[in-house]
A protein has these predicted regions:
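Conserved NTP-binding catalytic cores of kinases and kinase-like/nucleotidyltransferase enzymes
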Residues: 1-89, 213-214, 326-327
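An alpha-helical support segment within catalytic cores of ATP-dependent transferases
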Residues: 12-20, 144-145, 161-203, 213, ...
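Active-site acidic catalytic loop and adjacent metal/ATP-binding pocket
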Residues: 36-48, 52, 87, 186-234
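ATP-binding pocket architecture of kinase catalytic cores
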Residues: 46-143
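A cross-family kinase active-site recognition segment
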Residues: 91, 119-173, 196-198
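ATP/Mg2+ or Mg2+-diphosphate-binding catalytic cores
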Residues: 167-168, 285-328
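Active-site activation/catalytic loop segments of kinase-like enzymes and analogous catalytic loops
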Residues: 233-266, 282-298
Length: 328
């Protein structure tokens, strides 16, 4: 059973409080955080120290959680200027524990504002955003976890997932839009895959996961649950996708983010040319997955929060000749 088709755990705040006390020896206040496929609780200790209690989806593979723990440790050791959550050990010295069929971790809480909170981010901030993602991927370039180069649903190369889940989209015209971008991917990306470097990437550097400090500068990143070993260019493609979904003319924003990334981790010409194709495919994953999961979990409104914007974006770009779209 996949984590996207299995319901999340249903721990109550009082149970989260008890877990914190039993496993970590903490007396805390508890607040529920929004989450898509697992459960997250904000914890605040009596001394003011803040944490996030992460309770995995019951279908989650523990090896994937170990991957996340290892990656956070690696980044912190490789480049201390990149703020990422640290994983807290239990009173028994464990980084991951199991409770009622779910794997549990406690992470430090990263304070800050989200890029999403900035109504019209200026070019310098978008360049800084791109440069931050570049730094993150430079650190990942030295990271390897060979047993888990998985075929993840959110890996843009997983076109078979899009094809097999089109049935969950009711509108034939909407299906046709997704098919258009699948065909576009197969025509423009597949023949050039040998030129596109692969490595581990965060794979979800959207404007809800990248943090700003009080001075308005990029400070850190959270939520490593979608990590994948895939195209390096996908890191930028994911970030760009969520930045421009609501933009009628996104070229300026795109160029700023790409310029920042290029200043730290230069992409090849073929990778630059692939970006707009990967952006459109990522938006397809957003709408297809949303339609699939909201049929399974209609009560979870978090699932489809970006879907309307993604459809507008895709229908707009379906009329464009992507190879003529100058992204940088």
């Amino acid at each position: 059973m996949s984590v996207i088709s299995f319901p999340p755990s249903r721990f109550s705040p009082s149970e989260a409080h008890q877990i914190a006390k039993t496993l970590y020896g903490f007396e805390v206040s508890v607040k529920v955080l929004d989450s898509e496929r697992d459960q997250n609780f904000y914890l605040k200790r009596e001394d003011g120290k803040e944490f996030v209690l992460k309770i995995s989806n019951p279908a989650e593979d523990v090896e994937l959680i170990k991957l996340q723990v290892a990656s956070l440790k690696h980044i912190a050791n490789f480049d201390s200027s990149i703020q990422v959550p640290s994983t807290i050990q239990t009173v028994g010295g464990e980084f991951i524990s199991r409770h009622n069929g779910c794997f549990i971790r406690l992470q430090s809480f990263l304070a800050g504002h989200f890029i999403k909170d900035i109504e019209n981010p200026e070019s310098f901030l978008l360049e800084e955003f791109g440069a931050f993602l570049g730094k993150l991927d430079v650190s990942f370039r030295e990271f390897d976890y060979p047993d888990l180069k998985r075929k993840w649903i959110w890996d843009v190369r997983n076109i078979d997932f899009l094809k097999s889940h089109l049935v969950y989209i009711e509108s034939e015209s909407d299906k046709a839009v997704v098919r258009h971008f699948i065909a576009n991917y197969q025509l423009n990306i597949v023949p050039n895959e040998k030129y596109l470097r692969t490595q581990y990437i965060h794979n979800d550097g959207n404007d809800y996961n990248v943090l700003l400090n009080d001075n308005g500068h990029i400070s850190g990143v959270i939520d490593f649950g979608d990590m994948a070993h895939t195209f390096l260019a996908s890191e930028l493609a994911v970030a760009i996708t969520y930045l421009i979904l609501e933009e009628a003319e996104p070229e300026t924003k795109i160029k700023s983010v790409v310029q920042g990334f290029q200043s730290v981790y230069p992409l090849r010409d073929e990778e630059i040319e692939s970006l707009i194709h990967l952006v459109c495919v990522r938006a397809c994953f957003s709408v297809v997955t949303a339609n699939y999961r909201k049929k399974l979990f209609p009560e979870n409104k978090y699932i489809s929060v970006t879907e309307p914007y993604a459809w507008t974006f895709l229908k707009n770009f379906a009329d464009k000749e992507l190879n003529n779209f100058k992204i940088y």
